[in-house]
């Protein structure tokens, strides 16, 4: 029985069987061609293969030179069009990267925990002074200014009026000074306290005394000037006010008159030394 009758099957079309037969024949022919090509390649020598490789390299180099010359000979419009095309490609790539980064940020934000540490872009330079959340700044540690004495929040207050309103604070200052003096005079406390604590308390006591003495001296000077102006304006219809320089002279005269003899001698000696130094510096050999 022939091959054709062996492959006959009921319910199968003859055209499909013929197509299968042709495919089998073509596949056999391709296999024969491939085997013949392999035989031809195996029979080639190394010299002929080297010549073929050199010829291919020369042809590729010639083609590259030709393409370069043709690209240089193109008009500027084509270069501009190529630049626009490359710019459009770059912009499309950047837009794609932007949207991808946005998607990543949105996805990371959805998974972000409320106690996670804060993130910052590495593209921005880090400032020398950084605001660290949760860390107390030095500004908060400073005492808040009293708005009653802030000139930017209202009119300038008269210092004499402010002093008269808060004169009662002198009693509290004097009480603190007496308590601190008694504490430093206590021998039991001095034995228990360290040397550093004792020095700090002594400095605090000196500062409090100096502050209270300064306030009292200002009150005295203000009272002296008030009495002097009242005396010179006693019979005048228009009030006469002293200049700053005259006020200073009046205050110095009052202090000098109310000093003790020993204090007056010390003041005069300091003034003589001051004048002597000024005259000595004014000599010719001290000038450049």
UniProtKB/Swiss-Prot annotation:
Name the record gives this protein: rRNA biogenesis protein RRP36
Location (main, coarse): nucleus
Subunit details: Associates with 90S and pre-40S pre-ribosomal particles.
Biological process according to GO: maturation of SSU-rRNA from tricistronic rRNA transcript (SSU-rRNA, 5.8S rRNA, LSU-rRNA)
Biological source species: Eremothecium gossypii (strain ATCC 10895 / CBS 109.51 / FGSC 9923 / NRRL Y-1056) (Yeast)
InterPro entries per record: RRP36
Record keywords, A-Z: Coiled coil, Nucleus, Ribonucleoprotein, Ribosome biogenesis, rRNA processing
Listed Acidic residues bias regions: 86-101
Region (Disordered): 1-150
Short name of any one Pfam family annotated for the protein: RRP36
Coiled coil: 184-219
């Amino acid at each position: 029985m022939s091959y054709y009758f062996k492959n006959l099957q009921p319910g199968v079309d003859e055209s499909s069987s013929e197509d299968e037969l042709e495919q089998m024949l073509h596949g056999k022919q391709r296999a024969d061609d491939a085997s013949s090509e392999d035989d031809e390649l195996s029979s080639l020598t190394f010299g002929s293969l080297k010549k073929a490789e050199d010829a291919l390299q020369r042809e590729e180099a010639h083609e590259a030179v030709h393409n370069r010359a043709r690209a240089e000979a193109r008009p500027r419009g084509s270069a501009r069009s190529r630049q626009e095309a490359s710019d459009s490609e770059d912009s499309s790539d950047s837009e794609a990267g932007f949207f991808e980064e946005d998607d990543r940020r949105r996805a990371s934000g959805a998974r972000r925990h409320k106690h996670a540490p804060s993130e910052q872009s590495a593209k921005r330079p880090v400032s020398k002074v950084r605001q660290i959340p949760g860390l107390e700044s030095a500004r908060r540690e400073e005492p808040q200014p009293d708005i009653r004495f802030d000139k930017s929040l209202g009119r300038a207050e008269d210092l004499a009026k402010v002093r008269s309103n808060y004169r009662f604070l002198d009693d509290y200052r004097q009480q603190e000074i007496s308590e601190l003096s008694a504490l430093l005079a206590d021998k039991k406390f001095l034995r228990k306290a360290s040397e550093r604590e004792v020095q700090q308390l002594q400095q605090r006591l000196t500062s409090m005394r100096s502050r209270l003495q300064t306030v009292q001296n200002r009150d005295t000077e203000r009272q002296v000037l008030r009495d002097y102006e009242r005396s010179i304006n006693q019979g005048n219809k228009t009030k006469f006010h002293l200049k700053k320089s005259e006020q200073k002279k009046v205050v110095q005269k009052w202090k000098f008159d109310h000093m003790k003899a020993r204090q007056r001698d010390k003041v005069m000696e300091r003034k003589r030394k001051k004048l002597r130094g000024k005259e000595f510096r004014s000599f010719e050999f001290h000038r450049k």
